[in-house]
Amino acid sequence: MSDKSESYKVITDNRQARYLYEILETFEAGIQLTGTEVKSIRAGKVNLQDGYALLRDGEIWLINAHISPYNASGQYFNHEPRRTRKLLLHRQEIRKLIGKVEQQGLTLVPLKMYLKRGWVKVSIALGKGKKLHDKRESLKRRQDQRDMQRAMKNY
């Protein structure tokens, strides 16, 4: 029997977030979902590209993340694809995030969604928006790393 305590299956990854934001700190959050949303997530029909998280009334909400409607069920019991979903974190983590977002002007961005021990989890990050020259600089740095690796491989 396999050890499921540390295993997790990544459903979707928001690669654009790492390009647009400088990631300072990451958190693991649970997410409040309906049954058809969980079935769609298990099928891999999720998009976090336009998603972000907001603080409202001491709670954290995931906004604009697209979970496609589940095809096997009828339209009557299906969910709204872009509805606002509550993220579940410990109270002290929420207090820490409130302080950093309000005082330092940081943004909460979803990085990836995955299954951990049968539960759907979202990895959210505190991010600082990159300027255009920062994006170019990171691309240049990545290209230089590739060139150095190629040179090392040849010699």
From Swiss-Prot:
Alphabetized SUPFAM superfamilies for the sequence: Small protein B (SmpB)
One of the record's GO cellular component terms: cytosol
Keyword annotations from UniProtKB, A to Z: Cytoplasm, RNA-binding
Keyword Cytoplasm: yes
GO molecular function term, any single one: RNA binding
Localization in the cell: Cytoplasm
Similarity comment: Belongs to the SmpB family.
Job description of the protein: Required for rescue of stalled ribosomes mediated by trans-translation. Binds to transfer-messenger RNA (tmRNA), required for stable association of tmRNA with ribosomes. tmRNA and SmpB together mimic tRNA shape, replacing the anticodon stem-loop with SmpB. tmRNA is encoded by the ssrA gene; the 2 termini fold to resemble tRNA(Ala) and it encodes a 'tag peptide', a short internal open reading frame. During trans-translation Ala-aminoacylated tmRNA acts like a tRNA, entering the A-site of stalled ribosomes, displacing the stalled mRNA.
This protein's name: SsrA-binding protein
